[in-house]
């Protein structure tokens, strides 16, 4: 859809880095709901159907600690209640926006979830340090 509207659009996918994937490590800061785009070891059958064959230009690995920290910051400073994957998407968008070749360009990010499902997780646990 996006390329039909603008063939020059760049699409960047976001994935949890290997240490931040559920079941990928003992890290308590996993990012749920983001399938690995660029991991050839992750079978297509385990991915959501829209991901298989998805046309993107690059993918960015995001660490759980970065997604959690930005999710908490945005909740405190802007009152926007983000979930884990939304924090990851926003973190990746800031990486893309900081690239010199993107100066003056519009960066659009889709925030795929809300923080409501994560109230009982480490994302919003005040005693858990990022």
Regions found by a protein language model. Name each.
Residues 4-84, 122-130:
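Active-site/ligand-binding loops adjacent to catalytic centers
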Residues 94-109, 120-130:
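Catalytic phosphate/nucleotide-handling subdomain of diverse soluble enzymes
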Residues 85, 112-113:
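Short, loop-centered acidic/histidine patches that primarily coordinate divalent metals
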Residues 1-6, 97:
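Surface-exposed amphipathic alpha-helices with a cationic face
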Residues 13-15, 108-112:
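Short beta-strand segments
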Residues 19, 115-116:
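Surface-exposed, flexible loop/turn segments at secondary-structure boundaries
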Residues 67, 74, 90-99:
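A short, acidic, amphipathic alpha-helical segment used as a generic capping/interface helix at domain edges
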Residues 85-93, 118:
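Short glycine/serine/threonine-rich phosphate/pyrophosphate-binding segments
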């Amino acid at each position: 859809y996006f390329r039909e509207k603008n063939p020059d659009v760049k699409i960047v996918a976001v994935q949890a880095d290997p240490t931040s994937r559920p079941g990928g490590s003992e890290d308590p800061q996993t990012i749920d709901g983001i399938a690995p785009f660029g991991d050839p070891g992750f079978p297509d059958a385990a991915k959501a159907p829209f991901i298989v064959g998805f046309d993107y230009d690059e993918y960015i690995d995001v660490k759980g600690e970065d997604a959690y920290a930005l999710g908490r910051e945005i909740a405190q400073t802007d009152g926007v209640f983000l979930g884990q994957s939304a924090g990851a998407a926003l973190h990746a968008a800031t990486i893309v926006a900081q690239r010199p070749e993107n100066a003056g360009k519009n960066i659009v990010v889709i925030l795929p979830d809300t923080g409501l499902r994560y109230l009982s997780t480490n994302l919003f646990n005040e005693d858990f340090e990022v």
